[in-house]
Structures are given as C-alpha cells and as structure tokens.
Amino acid sequence: MKNLSPNRIQVSLSKPELVLNPYTGASGVYSAVVPDVSGLNQLEFLCKKLGVGFHPDETHCTVVYSKEAALTDPATAEPVAGKAFWYCLTHIEHWKGHDGKTYIVAGVCSPAVVMEHARLRRLGAKHSFTPFKAHITLSSDVEVTPEVQAKIDELNLELALAPGSASFINQKIVDVKKG
C-alpha cells in the first residue's frame, strides 16, 4: 500500500467492544462520528461488492480512543456542535488488529477528522493505538482468500477512478469503560 499522507485515515465498521457512557473524565475518552445517509449508502455498496454484511447502526469513524488518559478538563469535552466532517473514500485494505483478527477497512481522507483528533490530543487525550488510524471496519475476522483479495483490488480500481465522498456527523465524546 502507498505511503499515507498525514491527512489520510482509515475508517472501521466493526462493533465497538466498549460500553459508552456520558463524558465525566473518569475513564479515558472516546470520540466518534458517523457517516451521513450518503456515506452509509456508499459503505453499504462496498460491503455488497465485498460480499460481507453491512451494519449501519455500528458504523462510525473513531476520532480518538484514549483508554487511560482523560481530557484535562471535562468541560472542554464539548463536541463541535453541528459540524460535518467531510471525507473522501480512497481505498480498501486489510490489516491484522491488536486482537490478531484480520479486518477489511475502507480508507478515507478527512482533514477535519485529523484536526479534531489533534484538538482532543491537545486537551489531554492520548490515542491508545499509534499511529492514529481512525477507521470504518467493513468486516472483521476475515480470511483474505485470493477471491476476497480480487474483490478488494477491483474496488480499489473503482475508487481510484471515482472516489466516494460524504460527511461524518453527530460527534460523540464519552468515557471509555471496558465492557
């Protein structure tokens, strides 16, 4: 895969294995945004082409996941009200997660998400996985067979010619509590 620019991020559709609570600063900080209707439609199309299930209620882009470090002042944890975070779908790839499972993810470019991640870091969050790769997982615990790789390669050709674009909306900032 090509070197990623600082403004390129990965997006994950996996079900978070977290319990999300209102933000108090007691147990780390988690922030995420969700795709708008146009984005959900594009992601559903990608999942169909890959032959994997689509779970719109679990679809999100992680802005920051800080298991240990909370924001220095919980009062600063206000989401950017009404802000839409534009993004561009750029590619599909797979990687091994920290749990050893293989994930298929859709790559996006979103300077606004990168800037919000940096803002929350300046306020005290420490992203638990480096480098920062906010992501929407299209499928988890997948065996990447030659057939699956061929589907990924075909989608990457399509995205190279016509990348999708949409916006993330509805930012949430909450405590992280191991579930």
Regions found by a protein language model. Give the residues of each.
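Histidine-dependent nucleotide/RNA phosphoesterase domain, centered on the 2H-phosphoesterase fold
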Residues: 2-179
